[in-house]
């Protein structure tokens, strides 16, 4: 089983339908689709990207399960034509965290389970160009997974 694909799917499902101020926030996997229509909230285009992932064997391997650690990056972005505010990305990131912690720790038919979810990085980035300012809330989650053989 590809644990990276499974975890990415679970995160996508947990975030799907997320709204802020009555506006649904689009979610992209890997990168922003340049042809996508982005919603505007408080003058900024807003979206979420599920980015980098990695998986590696856990140091502890009990007899009845196979343990893996999987990291995944969620980036909440708001892009403004001029200067904007970090409020939107910070509020949306809080809702992202609530959804992740509330829905990901579910066992999938005794095949893959999530023991712990840790928010290992919570970072605010500001990027500027001559014409735009972008605010990103970067959330990196570390998932302790266990796989059983059925």
Task: Give, region by region, the residue ranges found by the protein language model.
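Short, cysteine-centered beta-strand-loop-beta hairpins and adjacent loop/turn segments enriched
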Residues: 55-61, 77-84, 146-150
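Small/polar-rich, solvent-exposed N-terminal microdomains that initiate assembly or binding
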Residues: 1-64, 103, 107-111
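Intrinsic-disorder/low-complexity loop/linker signature
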Residues: 22, 61, 83-86, 109, ...
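Extracellular/virion structural assembly segments
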Residues: 63-69, 77-103
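Oligomerization/assembly interface segments of phage tail-like spikes and tubes
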Residues: 66-82, 134-146
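Short capping loops/turns at secondary-structure boundaries
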Residues: 4, 85, 89, 130-134
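Acidic-leaning, charged glycine-interspersed low-complexity segments
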Residues: 44-46, 97-148
């Amino acid at each position: 089983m590809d644990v990276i694909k499974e975890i990415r799917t679970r995160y996508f499902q947990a975030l799907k339908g997320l709204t802020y101020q009555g506006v649904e926030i689009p979610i992209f996997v890997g990168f922003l689709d340049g042809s996508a229509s982005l919603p505007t909230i408080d003058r900024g285009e807003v979206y979420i990207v599920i980015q980098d992932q990695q998986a590696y064997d856990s140091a502890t391997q009990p007899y009845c399960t196979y343990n893996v650690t999987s990291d995944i990056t969620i980036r909440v972005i708001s892009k403004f034509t001029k200067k904007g505010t970090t409020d939107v990305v910070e509020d949306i990131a809080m809702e992202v965290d609530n959804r992740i912690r509330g829905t990901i720790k579910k066992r999938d038919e005794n095949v893959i389970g999530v023991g712990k979810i840790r928010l290992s990085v919570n970072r605010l980035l500001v990027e500027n160009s001559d014409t735009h300012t972008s605010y990103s809330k970067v959330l990196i989650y570390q998932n302790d997974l266990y796989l059983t053989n059925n």
